[in-house]
């Protein structure tokens, strides 16, 4: 995995990174120690192989470091979690993907 440098823009409620000046983001909302990942936006101009996966992993690692739970409401992020079961302990009790 290539670690992606992310910024938590809490004002806009999104995790951000830039690749060659192009903004990619994961929008979120938070409630009671849970982070709801609602939308992944990676412009087509970002063609770097494996970027989406590395970006999602970096965001999940950031959330994990803060001992928060994650609720993936974005289909792309839910699909990533299905394939990467090492993050399943981050899901709140009762949430299955």
Residue map of PLM features:
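Glycine-rich phosphate/pyrophosphate-binding loop shared by adenosine-nucleotide-utilizing enzymes
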Residues: 22-26, 35
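Structural motif
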Residues: 9-11, 31
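Conserved acetyl-CoA-binding loop-helix of GNAT-fold acetyltransferases
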Residues: 47-61
């Amino acid at each position: 995995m290539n670690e992606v440098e992310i910024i938590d823009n809490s004002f806009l409620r999104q995790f951000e990174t830039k690749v060659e000046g192009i903004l990619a983001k994961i929008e979120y909302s938070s409630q009671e120690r849970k982070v709801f990942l609602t939308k992944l936006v990676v412009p087509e101009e970002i063609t770097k192989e494996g970027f989406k996966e590395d970006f999602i992993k970096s965001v999940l690692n950031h959330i994990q470091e803060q001992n928060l739970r994650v609720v993936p409401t974005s289909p792309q992020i839910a699909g990533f979690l299905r394939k990467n079961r090492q993050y399943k302990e981050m899901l709140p009790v009762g949430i299955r993907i």
